[in-house]
């Protein structure tokens, strides 16, 4: 699972997921999976989508993960009274804005890449779209 090796502070405020995305262009591979909606991806979802793609392309080509879960999400145990401090870190998420490229792929045909990204998109809680690299 993806998570930071070390952080200055263990716990983080909830914050808001507003604004525009960085990393909106396909830069490493030929094809990409771009987020249309706004939300957050957990480390488990990122890994599940990566596995689905890797299995479908049968380890040919190359896959880049363009997102990293760097925000800790805490929760208190069940049946615990309010107060007594913030809960423990349960999992890590990455906040996604519309237009962010989530995954990139190279070395496979467009048809195979489309199928692989469709399988990956089924594992994600966001609406996504298939994009290709634009040559300037």
From Swiss-Prot:
Q: Taxonomically, which superkingdom?
A: Bacteria
Under Pfam families, the record lists: Ribosomal_L16
Say yes or no: keyword Membrane present. Answer: no
CC annotations in GO: cytosolic large ribosomal subunit
Any one GO molecular-function label of the UniProt entry: structural constituent of ribosome
Cross-referenced SUPFAM superfamilies, in alphabetical order?
Ribosomal protein L16p/L10e
Q: Give the UniProt record's GO annotations in the biological process aspect.
A: translation
Query: Which protein family is it in?
Result: Belongs to the universal ribosomal protein uL16 family.
Known role: Binds 23S rRNA and is also seen to make contacts with the A and possibly P site tRNAs.
The annotated subunit structure for this chain is: Part of the 50S ribosomal subunit.
Know the name of this protein?
Large ribosomal subunit protein uL16
What is the protein's species of origin? Shewanella halifaxensis (strain HAW-EB4)
Source organism phylogeny: Bacteria, Pseudomonadati, Pseudomonadota, Gammaproteobacteria, Alteromonadales
């Amino acid at each position: 699972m993806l998570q930071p090796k070390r952080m200055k502070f263990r716990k983080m405020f909830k914050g808001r997921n507003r604004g525009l995305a960085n990393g909106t262009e396909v830069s490493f591979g030929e094809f990409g999976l771009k987020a249309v909606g706004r939300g957050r991806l957990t480390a488990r979802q990122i890994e599940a989508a990566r596995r689905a793609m890797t299995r479908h392309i049968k380890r040919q080509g190359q896959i880049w993960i363009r997102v990293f879960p760097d925000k800790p999400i805490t929760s208190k145990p069940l049946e615990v009274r309010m107060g007594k401090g913030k809960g423990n870190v349960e999992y890590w998420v990455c906040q996604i804005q519309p237009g962010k490229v989530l995954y990139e792929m190279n070395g496979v045909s467009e048809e195979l890449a489309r199928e692989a990204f469709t399988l990956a998109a089924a594992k994600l809680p966001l609406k996504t779209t298939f994009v290709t690299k634009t040559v300037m």
